[in-house]
Amino acid sequence: MLIADCLELMGFSDFYGNADVIHRLRDMLARNRFPHAVILAGPAGSGKYTLSLMLAKAMNCLSPILTEDLPDFCSKCSNCVRIAQAEDLDTRFTEAIEAREGLRETDKKETRLFVQTHPDVLVIPPDPPQMMIKVDQVRRVIETIYFRPGEAKERVYIFSDSAFMKEAANSLLKVLEEPPEFATIFLLADNPGALLPTIRSRSMICSLAALPAQEVEQYLAKYRPDWNSKQRALVARLSEGAVGRARSFDLAAYTAARSHALTILGSALRNIDHSELFKVTETYRAGAEGREKTEKLLRTLYSLLQDLTFLNSGTPELVRNTDIQADLKKLAESSDFNWIAFVSDRLNDVERGMRRNLLRSLSLDAFATAVEQEVPNR
């Protein structure tokens, strides 16, 4: 999934959390010892993309400043302003897809997705429908990286995902073996282990840690005053320490999906009337909107299963859906670890079915029937 923390960034002081990591990166900039390839690792919403753009600004700011005796950017010069236009990655990504859809069919197949709001800063997102970095995208990097920047001090390339097709990953290795002195490559990875070992060995890995829930709540108190304290506490736990994810969290959509998830699990565990279950599954239709809705439901089901695991293992303090803990306890009383593992496997089956374009409502009905048959002591 592609999410950017769309802040009006004024400097490194606006990056929330991971102060030691930011200090180390800025110190390397100050000493002109910044590596040519950096893997920014951390969970979705931890600020990897935001930080990569901040560093691109700091490298290329026309009126650089010092804060805390370390390099910072002005946010006002032409380079900073143009780089900032790439901050809303979701919107830029959608625009790129729409632009490609407007091409002739023969041109569509040969056109790869890029986001570029500054001539010397190129963002390379995963290319649909596989949502992976493709070899033609890496070839574009190879074609341009050895030319000196035209309007900036440093060419910057940002791969917004670590999912590379095999040929693309091998092509990237060639660049990493002999990078030019005036170019920097950022690889953003939820899991750096997904990258080839040879790519990792040629890059500096910089990890952004998840923040404590209390810090995320403090952040939300400032940036989401429309939420009450209980809502902020819930989102802080659900976002797993990622402030970008927390700030953009769609609470209404999540609670709607959670209501459906509870109906599905409750139907299986409590052996109740299935009419409500079928009313729920019938709403998951074909098409892009239905696919997104189903993906949210599956993520929510996984979240509830994790909470059931915490309750069954005697660690209720780890439960994330704290506002429905009473409902979860009732479900936990009827479940065990084997059943939870079985349900997780069946969710994987639904996901595989989605990739084969199976009818979602029927897949969910089959899922609910299967998990009911495995309920303990029935």
Question: What does each model-found stretch correspond to?
Answer:
Residues D136-V138, L173, R200:
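"Short basic amphipathic alpha-helical interaction patches in structured regions
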Residues F164-E167, P179, A194-L195:
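Catalytic P-loop NTPase motifs of RecA-like helicase/translocase cores
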Residues K57, R140, K174-L176, M204-I205:
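Glycine-rich, phosphate-binding/catalytic loops in enzymes
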Residues Y146, N170-L187:
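Conserved catalytic/switch belt of AAA+ P-loop NTPases
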Residues L7, G11-P71, R82, E181-T184, ...:
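Charged, glycine-rich active-site and insertion segments that engage polyanionic ligands
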